[in-house]
């Protein structure tokens, strides 16, 4: 086949394969952006105005020091936080919301992502993101790490005791 332009959407899981195919055919590629972040869970009332008035709020902030783009993504009103597993059992966090009333929770969750564009000679942003996820998995034996905002501000890990005293009940029950 021949074409002036093609679109290929292989996703993160197919990126290594696609890069190999391109290299084998002499096709130049560009290093993409990697998004690294956390999933934030708050009580519904915190996000009530945005949840009622927007389908999905897209909040964007640029950091003053490095001008990094920080954004919200995948907001789940009255939803739950969930674990997803990638190749080799890599645990990552995601969120879901359900239409049915019986599955709704009292919490809203969303991803808070920092978008990083690296400069040459760096070529592997997806591998970089995976390495960060693997280090997180190492800290908590392959589970999802949970931390309250208060503990984050104090620079300490959240203990089960402090989590039980929190005014928000996390929807992901096996987080550590």
Each PLM stretch: what is its role?
Residues 1-176:
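Residues forming the flavin
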């Amino acid at each position: 086949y021949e074409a002036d332009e093609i679109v290929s959407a292989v996703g993160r899981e197919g990126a290594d394969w696609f890069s190999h195919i391109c290299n084998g055919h002499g096709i130049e590629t560009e290093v993409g952006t990697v998004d690294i972040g956390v999933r934030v869970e708050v009580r519904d009332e915190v996000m009530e105005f945005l949840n009622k008035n927007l389908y999905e709020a897209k909040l964007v902030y640029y950091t003053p020091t490095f001008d990094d783009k920080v954004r919200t993504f995948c907001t789940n009103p009255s939803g739950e936080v969930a674990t997803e597993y990638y190749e080799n059992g890599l645990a990552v966090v995601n969120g879901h919301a359900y239409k049915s009333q019986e599955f709704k929770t009292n919490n809203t969750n969303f991803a808070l992502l920092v978008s990083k564009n690296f400069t040459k000679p760096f070529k592997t942003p997806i591998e970089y993101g995976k390495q960060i996820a693997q280090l997180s998995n190492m800290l908590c034996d392959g589970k999802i790490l949970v931390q309250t905002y208060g503990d984050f501000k104090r620079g300490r890990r959240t203990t089960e005791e402090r989590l039980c005293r929190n005014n928000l009940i996390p929807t992901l029950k096996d987080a550590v």
